[in-house]
Amino acid sequence: MAQSKLYPVVMAGGSGSRLWPLSRVLYPKQFLCLKGDLTMLQTTICRLNGVECESPVVICNEQHRFIVAEQLRQLNKLTENIILEPAGRNTAPAIALAALAAKRHSPENDPLMLVLAADHVIADEDAFRAAVRNAMPYAEAGKLVTFGIVPDLPETGYGYIRRGEVSAGEQDTVAFEVAQFVEKPNLETAQAYVASGEYYWNSGMFLFRAGRYLEELKKYRPDILDACEKAMSAVDPDLDFIRVDEDAFLACPEESVDYAVMERTADAVVVPMDAGWSDVGSWSSLWEISAHTAEGNVCHGDVINHKTENSYVYAESGLVTTVGVKDLVVVQTKDAVLIADRNAVQDVKKVVEQIKADGRHEHRVHREVYRPWGKYDSIDAGDRYQVKRITVKPGEGLSVQMHHHRAEHWVVVAGTAKVTIDGDIKLLGENESIYIPLGATHCLENPGKIPLDLIEVRSGSYLEEDDVVRFADRYGRV
């Protein structure tokens, strides 16, 4: 029997607040470069190098779709393989969508699915790949494999898996029947778990056949499967995205894969993984897994420390200096600064809740915002004016649009701009400018080979992004 195809499924939903101000609702941590030059999503995908598998399937929120597409494109992994969730419904429905898509792509057999989170750090990638290979025979045989992280300390922030009897498998493979899933314990209980040697951290990574998962979901949560089947029956292909039926998916109950299937099935096994795993759940955990200076500091960007110890200092856009401090987290972005005791960073989410309650925007969006055509940076704003730096990628362009409440001035800084205003087309080079009157139908394109940079000055009574009427758009946003 030929080996089943293996589809990596990367869960890239979620918009956590624990790494604010870097992580925002519209740009959460899985899309950030926290270690090295690749984002967490890209690192997750590159970790599969050396594992024989198909192109990854990525599941994400619709509002993150262009970020995911661009990051996959940079890896040459963009192959109409992004499933869009109209709204988050937790992991059981998301995995069901991926399983139905995998079965549709490989109807000749029951493909394997390697379910991964986009925002985990794994230091020993060889150990990760070895654990995946170890788990393959069990998944091929119909088991539902969960990967248990060998704990190195009594962590109270993770759930645990208690192993049972050894599960019969091929020579040189090791797996155990799952005896119990347990919630996050207190410290005393966690210490007992680690001392026993019978418990693993629950990693949230899985390997099983798509059909076997759907069978178990039908057995234990047929309502979830029914909603997901209806959502996938009316798929709308859109560029590199798979859009499911919104109404059908919104009717789907929310449930985690652990509660829906893994805690109920009789075929769950746990494969140990000792690979330097972390879910990077806080600034303190990021400090722990990063390279330190002799003083115990972790620095990113333009940083000068003096008599500073055991601190995490991140400078995004300017010089950050520290003097005579220790055990701090200092994070500077273009529009917000966090200063926290490293042992109290679990309360960062409370600050984010306050920002949201105050009606501010810093919890939701960065000053620099990415779009399918490029990005813009909100440089300055005041009464009836706003200044942005706009970058348009070669060959890309903004929608044909108009605004009810603002006029715009554009000044080209670098590259070439093709500007259409009420049907009149003009080409602008460096240091040339143009005025777009209020109510004019207009479009901006980059016909050149290098990025187009321009300064936009908006003026008017209302300057927010929702003052736009789109008439045509190459990215399907009309």
From Swiss-Prot:
It comes from the Bacteria. The gene is manC1. GO terms for biological process: GDP-mannose biosynthetic process; polysaccharide biosynthetic process. Belongs to the mannose-6-phosphate isomerase type 2 family. It holds the Pfam family MannoseP_isomer. SUPFAM superfamilies: Nucleotide-diphospho-sugar transferases, RmlC-like cupins. This is Mannose-1-phosphate guanylyltransferase 1. The keyword GTP-binding applies. Coiled coil: none annotated. It comes from Escherichia coli O157:H7. Involved in GDP-mannose biosynthesis which serves as the activated sugar nucleotide precursor for mannose residues in cell surface polysaccharides. In vitro, shows very broad substrate specificities for four nucleotides and various hexose-1-phosphates, yielding ADP-mannose, CDP-mannose, UDP-mannose, GDP-mannose, GDP-glucose and GDP-2-deoxy-glucose.
